[in-house]
UniProtKB/Swiss-Prot annotation:
Belongs to the UPF0346 family. Pfam families: YozE_SAM_like (PF06855). It comes from the Bacteria. This is UPF0346 protein OB1736.
Length: 75
């Protein structure tokens, strides 16, 4: 079964040194409305545009999405 973006994002939780990736992961974990079962860029991107937790969240998401897609292609 294919890993969702949310599952991929959760690998960034719990870092001792916080960065934008871990901040987005912590926010998604605590946000009950985050589209946890989505693998669609547009759905998650639109959600973040309306509910952005910090100013660079959409840029962080784009970077993480590229990594997510790259890892999916590798498997």
């Amino acid at each position: 079964m294919e890993q969702t973006f949310y599952q991929f994002l959760m690998t960034y939780r719990g870092k001792l040194e916080k960065d934008d990736n871990s901040e987005l992961a912590e926010w998604a974990f605590r946000n009950h409305n985050f589209p946890k079962h989505s693998n669609t860029y547009d759905e998650i991107s639109n959600y973040l545009e309306w509910n952005s937790p910090f100013p660079s969240a959409t840029v962080t998401f784009d970077s993480l999405w590229n990594e997510y897609e790259w890892k999916k292609a590798a498997y």
